[in-house]
Swiss-Prot record:
Family according to the record: Belongs to the 4-hydroxy-2-oxovalerate aldolase family.
Stated name of the protein: 4-hydroxy-2-oxovalerate aldolase
Residues of the site described as Transition state stabilizer: R15
Top-level taxon in the UniProt lineage: Bacteria
GO biological process, one term: L-leucine biosynthetic process
Pyruvate carboxyltransferase domain location: 7-257
Native organism taxonomy: Bacteria, Bacillati, Bacillota, Bacilli, Bacillales
PANTHER family, sorted: 2-ISOPROPYLMALATE SYNTHASE 1, CHLOROPLASTIC-RELATED (PTHR10277:SF9), HOMOCITRATE SYNTHASE-RELATED (PTHR10277)
Species in which this protein is naturally found: Geobacillus thermodenitrificans (strain NG80-2)
Binding site for substrate: R15, D16, S169, H196, Y287
């Protein structure tokens, strides 16, 4: 396929997909996936803990392998693709950013809650000092008005971001909402716009196409839909759809299909599908990585995981507040016991 691109895809299976396998990636798995992605001519490959650099912890989930080892492994086998990392200020620090840059990372995505772009300034500034491509990543974008989103995106642009993303962390946005947000950003910013979707309402592809139609040129995908919740926009399908539309990605479709079937599918612990819990994530507007945490808490306290997720949505809990899952599960169990005792 031509190396010319209308759409630049970032493959997130080695970062967002980490959530789906409880952060258990091995060096061997990362090498095999990254090498195949590079051979398929995917331009960007994101590698890090599911919650970004330094995410390995009791709160977010312990990594099987140190993420710096995984980053080094991916860099070592990629001849064309650029390795990217995710960094959430407050979890990852400048120290981790510097360490990743030393290991050959070329792009960092600085992720904040959609209303907290101001905390990205230091990290975006440092990324540019290191010569990295800096991306502003506005998570849980469904939780802010379009006007607020534009305001926050402008802040990231002012700090030096090369790209700003609308990030549908909960898979809660509907296509017309994506259209409105991307259109407003395109009219208000002078930098590229990106979109990151989740498939909890079976709308990842529709939302991605809506974003592209309004001018988004940076798009996230996950091979075999390997990501938090019900996964992300499925990369190999996205490449096929965009080819049908006539938009160039530069990605080899057959190689992506083979990678999905032969390398990634065996890594999946269970098939990526829209389960009742992932559906509730999109319905209630809850951070997609909360699904497995909620399932474990539900089992521990003998309650329905859906009740936990719905309550999380009501309280507008955001990424970084995983400890609330246990608190809410305990509250529901306590109320259940009290009701049963009457």
């Amino acid at each position: 396929m031509s190396s010319e691109r209308d759409i630049w895809i970032t493959e997130v299976a080695l970062r967002d997909g980490s959530h789906a396998i409880n952060h258990q990636y091995t060096v061997e798995q990362v090498v095999s996936v990254a090498q195949a992605l590079d051979e398929a001519n995917v331009p960007y490959i994101e590698v890090s803990h599911g919650d970004g650099l330094a995410g390995s912890s009791l709160q977010y989930g312990l990594s099987r392998t140190d993420e710096m080892e995984l980053i080094e492994a991916a860099v070592s086998v990629c001849k064309k693709a650029k390795i990217a990392v995710l960094l959430l200020p407050g979890i990852g620090t400048i120290r981790e950013l510097d360490a990743a840059a030393k290991r050959g990372v070329k792009m960092v995505r600085i992720a904040t809650h959609v209303t907290e772009a101001d905390i990205s300034a230091q990290h975006i500034t440092r990324a540019k000092e290191l010569g990295l491509e800096a991306v502003g990543f506005l998570m849980m974008s469904h939780m802010a008005s379009t006007e607020k989103l534009v305001e926050q995106a402008k802040l990231m642009e002012s700090y030096g971001a090369d790209v700003v993303y609308v990030v549908d962390s909960a898979g809660a946005l509907l296509p017309h909402e994506v259209t409105e947000r991307i259109r407003a950003l395109k009219q208000s910013l002078g930098i590229e716009i990106g979109f990151h979707g989740h498939n909890n309402l079976s709308l990842a592809m529709a939302n991605t196409l809506a974003a592209i139609q309004e001018g988004a040129t940076r798009i996230d995908g996950s091979v075999r839909c390997l990501g938090a919740g019900a996964g992300n926009t499925q990369t190999e399908v996205l490449v096929a759809v965009l080819d049908r539309i006539g938009l160039k990605t530069g990605v080899d479709l057959y190689k992506m299909m083979d990678l999905a079937e032969e390398i990634v599918a065996p890594i999946l612990q269970v098939p990526q599908e829209i389960t009742r819990d992932s559906l509730i994530l999109g319905y209630a507007g809850v951070y997609s990585s909360f699904r497995l945490h909620a399932e474990r808490a539900a089992k521990r306290f003998g309650v329905d995981s859906r009740d936990i997720l719905v309550e999380l949505g009501k309280r507008k809990v955001v990424g970084g507040q995983e400890d609330m899952i246990i608190d809410i599960a305990a509250e529901i169990a306590s109320k259940k016991t009290a009701t049963g005792a009457r």
